[in-house]
Amino acid sequence: MTDRFQQLLASIKPVDMNLTSAVKAHLDDLTKPQGSLGRLEEIAMKYCIATGTSKPSLSKKKVFCFAGDHGVAAEGVSAFPAEVTPQMVYNMLGGGAAINVLSRHAGADLEVVDMGVNHDFAEHPMLRRCKVKHGSANMAEGPAMSIDETLQAIMAGAELAIEAREQGYELLATGEMGIANTTPATALYSVLLDMSVNAITGRGTGIDDERLHHKIAVIEKAIEVNRANLATPLEVLAALGGFEIAGICGLILGAASVGMPVVVDGFISSSAAVCAIKLSCKVSDYLFFSHLSNEQGHRAVMQKLGARPILDLDLRLGEGTGAAMAMQVIEASLKIYNEMATFSSAGVSGKND
């Protein structure tokens, strides 16, 4: 497993920045003042560079919603009981969740991935069964996952991305479902980005002040308990992460290895993206951060990464909802790039010198 993981990392190539001039020249020749479409032009530029072409296409999109349970839920850090995780997976499989509506609206396929739910699901056409274990261990008492389990989850996610590329998908999005997963996400940010737990811990699904203070204490305890196992990014992910977070990390690494961009959802998915970046800094150029989460700390995380999310809608649901919305903006930017007339083709006079 370790050899395959190292091969995955080695297969991630830097993007070709030499495309920049050709893409910019085309954007500047469109029938508009240069730069007047603002971030749409930036997004089109990034997509072209990530995909390695000045003639981009986007015909197939897919959202992967990774699900997993967390042992740390036993510490009472969430407003909801752990059994909500499988219940929400069933809701997604039945078409009733927000991500079902928004992925459909975006014209994206949706697949739910069981990475570590504490429940056994029957086969379903929308479900991919990649279960590593029935939930992570309680990170407040020791490592959430072993290194082998973490690698298994990462490689499963990577294989999903590589398979999607082979099936003709050109853009992927991440989502997640897992009660208590803002707790491991916050711990990952704290260690990997050297951020204060107190400053970035939020209310998740809506906990009160008393439980928020308790959540902060649990995260700080988990970091201290696992202090001896935090030497590398992989060890940090194993000790303080979760199966769905590791799966998303793998999806990002796998997509980058085949030159495919990924739209990252909110607070949880961004923690997986941080893990992927720490494992291979080259993946940054393949990532679109979809939205600024309303979860406390996400703004500071984005600033640390030097990232500017596409949307700011006060979302804090997860599931991939923000990523599905942002996919539509990316698609709009590419339609501008591909379908607008140029000054030369339309016979429109350019700007006076």
UniProtKB/Swiss-Prot annotation:
Q: How would you classify this enzyme at the top EC level?
A: transferase
Pfam families (alphabetical): DBI_PRT
Q: Name one GO biological process term.
A: cobalamin biosynthetic process
EC number from the UniProt entry: 2.4.2.21
Reaction(s) catalysed (UniProt annotation): 5,6-dimethylbenzimidazole + nicotinate beta-D-ribonucleotide = alpha-ribazole 5'-phosphate + nicotinate + H(+)
What keywords are annotated for this sequence in UniProt? Cobalamin biosynthesis, Glycosyltransferase, Transferase
**Example GO molecular function term?**
nicotinate-nucleotide-dimethylbenzimidazole phosphoribosyltransferase activity
- Can you tell me which residues form the catalytic site? 319 (proton acceptor)
Pathway(s) served = Nucleoside biosynthesis; alpha-ribazole biosynthesis; alpha-ribazole from 5,6-dimethylbenzimidazole: step 1/2
Q: What does this protein do?
A: Catalyzes the synthesis of alpha-ribazole-5'-phosphate from nicotinate mononucleotide (NAMN) and 5,6-dimethylbenzimidazole (DMB).
PANTHER family, A to Z: NICOTINATE-NUCLEOTIDE--DIMETHYLBENZIMIDAZOLE PHOSPHORIBOSYLTRANSFERASE
Q: Which family does it belong to?
A: Belongs to the CobT family.
Q: What is this protein called?
A: Nicotinate-nucleotide--dimethylbenzimidazole phosphoribosyltransferase
Species of origin reads Chlorobaculum parvum (strain DSM 263 / NCIMB 8327) (Chlorobium vibrioforme subsp. thiosulfatophilum)
Q: Which gene encodes it?
A: cobT
